[in-house]
Amino acid sequence: MIDNYSTAREKMLREQIVARGVTDMATLDAILEVPRHFFVDEGQRMRAYGDYPLSITEGQTISQPYIVAYMTSLLQLTASDTVLEIGTGSGYQAAILSKICRQVYTVECIHSLLNKARKVFDSLRYFNIRSKYDDGSRGWSEFAPYDAIIVTAGSPEIPTPLLDQLADGGRMVIPVGPRYEQVLKRVTKEGDDFVVEDLAPVRFVDLVGVHGWK
């Protein structure tokens, strides 16, 4: 079974991610290393490497592998970076980030999801991930500024606290727009200014919070 999962992961990388143009080697290496099937329910493990999102619990999903890889590559991460993730979900995205950068901070507003993700982090010995239960739209100011911020839920607008917590030269990737239809944006902080790029149409679950969907 281990060989089957490894083969499925290699096929996923080759056919779903590299074939669609993701070339960042740090991202590709992380995708190949992290066992995605550990982040879904046991009954769905054989589907973990398919070209689609999967339901987890509490009405949430684990994103399609390509989207995880694409968003990660847009952050242009280095080994010395600290990253803030908004929306821990299954924990898979945080695990990918942890293989690339120095420290990951992740915030989740659904307690049962966070507890489940923490157990997987511990079992896989991903010790450079720090997590908390909170309103992710507020960010995590204690450890700011961050070299990169990734938001894995759709927001009606870019939350001001997240902009405030981005380091100079930092990058943020976030889905912005109405429910069920957002635009993936990359925000780069340049001094006192923010450069915003519109990249792709996407569909994410809601970012629920004071600075997201109420």
Curated annotation (Swiss-Prot):
The active site is at S63. InterPro entries: PCMT, SAM-dependent_MTases_sf. One of its GO terms (cellular component) is cytoplasm. It catalyses: [protein]-L-isoaspartate + S-adenosyl-L-methionine = [protein]-L-isoaspartate alpha-methyl ester + S-adenosyl-L-homocysteine. One of its GO terms (biological process) is protein repair. Keywords: Cytoplasm, Methyltransferase, S-adenosyl-L-methionine, Transferase. GO terms for molecular function: protein-L-isoaspartate (D-aspartate) O-methyltransferase activity. Signal peptide: none annotated. Its EC number is 2.1.1.77. It is found in: Cytoplasm. Gene3D superfamilies: Vaccinia Virus protein VP39. Catalyzes the methyl esterification of L-isoaspartyl residues in peptides and proteins that result from spontaneous decomposition of normal L-aspartyl and L-asparaginyl residues. It plays a role in the repair and/or degradation of damaged proteins. Belongs to the methyltransferase superfamily. L-isoaspartyl/D-aspartyl protein methyltransferase family. PANTHER family: PROTEIN-L-ISOASPARTATE O-METHYLTRANSFERASE (PTHR11579), PROTEIN-L-ISOASPARTATE(D-ASPARTATE) O-METHYLTRANSFERASE (PTHR11579:SF0). This is Protein-L-isoaspartate O-methyltransferase. It comes from Desulfotalea psychrophila (strain LSv54 / DSM 12343). The gene is pcm.
